[in-house]
UniProtKB/Swiss-Prot annotation:
Disulfide bonds: none annotated. Its main location: cytoplasm. This is Nucleoside diphosphate kinase. Major role in the synthesis of nucleoside triphosphates other than ATP. The ATP gamma phosphate is transferred to the NDP beta phosphate via a ping-pong mechanism, using a phosphorylated active-site intermediate. Homotetramer. GO terms for biological process: CTP biosynthetic process; GTP biosynthetic process; UTP biosynthetic process. Belongs to the NDK family. The active site is at 115 (pros-phosphohistidine intermediate). The lineage of its organism: Bacteria, Pseudomonadati, Chlamydiota, Chlamydiia, Chlamydiales. One of its GO terms (cellular component) is cytoplasm. It comes from Chlamydia pneumoniae. InterPro entries: NDK-like_dom (IPR034907), NDK-like_dom_sf (IPR036850), Nucleoside_diP_kinase (IPR001564).
Length: 144
């Protein structure tokens, strides 16, 4: 089973969309293997988005991500990375397919409801950034 990282961004948290977004993930067959609510510091946001540090939108992205609490999740399931990206929709909510998270809850390219890992390799790095191994459960393991 694959795992991927998802972040419910400050705009979705402040508008009380957490439950709806979690339901979308679970109804699609993805399981929640870890979850925490936190308010990112400037340093944490800069570290997480370090790969974008040379891009013109970097500071605006960091400022947005520290503007309020976020919910950080590890999602687990078959093809978790690609499934999560399909559920999220295009980065620009105006271009996102109807019914996707960003089409429903996003406002703009910068204020677009959720983040999701783009590759399995990046998912592993991003998960390790926010969670220790002991915090991530095997969500696909059947209960005894």
């Amino acid at each position: 089973m694959e795992q991927t990282l998802s972040i419910i961004k400050p705009d979705s948290v402040s508008k009380a969309h957490i439950g709806e977004i979690l339901s979308i993930f679970e109804q699609s067959g993805l399981r929640i293997a870890a979850m925490k609510m936190m308010h990112l510091s400037q340093t944490e946001a800069e570290g997480f988005y370090f790969v974008h540090r040379e891009r013109p939108f970097f500071q605006e992205l960091v400022d947005f991500m520290v503007s309020g609490p976020v919910v950080v999740l590890v999602l687990e399931g078959a093809n978790a990375v690609s499934r999560n990206r399909e559920l999220m929709g295009a980065t620009n909510p105006a271009e996102a397919a109807s019914g996707t998270i960003r089409a429903k809850f996003g406002e703009s390219i910068g204020v677009n409801a959720v983040h999701g890992s783009d590759t399995l390799e990046n998912a592993a790095v991003e998960i390790a950034y926010f969670f220790s191994k002991i915090e991530v459960v095997n969500a696909s393991k059947p209960l005894v």
